[in-house]
Amino acid sequence: MFIDTARIYIKAGDGGNGIISFRREKYVAYGGPDGGDGGKGGDVIFIADPNLSTLLDFKYRKKYIAQNGENGRGKNQYGKNGEDLYIKVPVGTLIINDETGEIIADLVKPNQKAIVLRGGKGGRGNAKFATPTLKTPRFAESGEKGKEMWVRLELKLLADVGLIGFPNAGKSTLLASCTRAKPKIANYPFTTLTPNLGVVEHKGKSFVMADIPGLIEGAHRGEGLGHDFLRHIERTKMLIHVVDVSASEGRDPIEDFEKINEELKLYSERLLTLSQIVAANKIDIQSGKENFPAFEKEIKKRGYEVYPISALTKVGIDKLLDKTIEILSSIPVEEIKEVPEVIVYTPPEEEETLNIEVKDNTYYLSGTKIDKLLKRVNLQDEHSLRYFEMLLRKSGVIDALKEKGFKSGDTINVRDFEFEYYE
């Protein structure tokens, strides 16, 4: 089954907690603090696997969580770092922030990596807080929580030539005639519901051809799976527009041609700048032979070259492929942009806020600034509370409180925990 979009939840590992510990050794009366730091949480890393061709795995599993770091230990032992989580995706996968729509990474190279979420830092053990004036700190930091987010994955096929046209125009048959690909072929609307790829080898040259599923009017708005199909055209170098010139489906070949190009234009005008040649298919049918002269005349008026073919009997295929190779050879090679082996994504920082509300001489603190400070302390522990007070001073919160009339001895309330602050 071919799946080219997915939405998944990812979370980096939490940092391990620092530990409170004191050296206990025979003949050492005052060993001092020896609590070790917690380990770092595991990162979430995407890797482009050349052996994958679909996002099918993500249909059955939606949550991916990296390993947490281990807590620190006594004797100044650090906790073990959490293992990084590697998520394999096909080459050509876009990773998008589902909330903002921001493109995080475009993995276009085999084995290319994207570090999307960094694991939380480990908390510091009490040994790190020992000072000449605080020789036996009885508190430690909690580990930092790993970041989390929902991401959208979109697979865009990497092909040189895209086959476009209405359903049943003969694209799958043409792909099968030119390559060893074996797409399912039948005479039903939307016969091909997934793109198929094949390698064309012709007169010593080779290129990748993609059969883009049949489009309908309104495809640019997403109708008839339109967005899913049009996405795959974006990376192609040129297009072969397959038209059923026999009108076997009861449609007018000229109108078919115009409608498909209109859909391309409405989706992205850049698609119309791609080189495009027209394959007038089903020329082996009597109505195809009769319709071809008028069709060719109209298409040439629009500036396109037309090649009469029969994808079924392979009539005219050689000339079509000759022209395709000629065009591909003439397309200037894009200046190769250096593709980084590893992409490191930095999520947008949450805007820092500090809210102060005063009621009955009690100062209520809230906001992202306070949340960040609280993540690494335990207010129920007296020593940790003293450390929190120091953080309030260093971060400028106490100065902000003083601007509101706060003075030494007043009460501070944080998440319903109240304490008196003295300088």
Curated annotation (Swiss-Prot):
The keyword Hydrolase applies. Residues 159-329 form the OBG-type G domain. PANTHER family: DEVELOPMENTALLY REGULATED GTP-BINDING PROTEIN-RELATED, MITOCHONDRIAL RIBOSOME-ASSOCIATED GTPASE 2. Residues 1-158 form the Obg domain. GO terms for biological process: ribosome biogenesis. Residues 346-423 form the OCT domain. It is an enzyme of class 3 (hydrolase). It holds the Pfam family DUF1967. Belongs to the TRAFAC class OBG-HflX-like GTPase superfamily. OBG GTPase family. This is GTPase Obg. Mg(2+) binds at S172, T192. Keywords: Cytoplasm, GTP-binding, Hydrolase, Magnesium, Metal-binding, Nucleotide-binding. SUPFAM superfamilies: Obg GTP-binding protein C-terminal domain (SSF102741), Obg GTP-binding protein N-terminal domain (SSF82051), P-loop containing nucleoside triphosphate hydrolases (SSF52540). Its main location: cytoplasm. GO terms for cellular component: cytoplasm. The lineage of its organism: Bacteria, Bacillati, Bacillota, Clostridia, Thermoanaerobacterales. InterPro entries: G_OBG (IPR031167), GTP-bd (IPR006073), GTP-bd_Obg/CgtA (IPR014100), GTP-bd_prot_GTP1/OBG_C_sf (IPR036346), GTP1-OBG_CS (IPR006074), GTP1_OBG_dom (IPR006169), GTP1_OBG_dom_sf (IPR036726), OBG_GTPase (IPR045086). GTP binds at residues 165-172, 190-194, 211-214, 281-284, 310-312. It is found in: Cytoplasm. Its cofactor is Mg(2+). It comes from the Bacteria. NCBIfam families: Obg_CgtA (TIGR02729), Obg_CgtA_exten (TIGR03595), PRK12296.1 (NF008954), PRK12297.1 (NF008955), PRK12299.1 (NF008956), small_GTP (TIGR00231). The keyword GTP-binding applies. An essential GTPase which binds GTP, GDP and possibly (p)ppGpp with moderate affinity, with high nucleotide exchange rates and a fairly low GTP hydrolysis rate. Plays a role in control of the cell cycle, stress response, ribosome biogenesis and in those bacteria that undergo differentiation, in morphogenesis control.
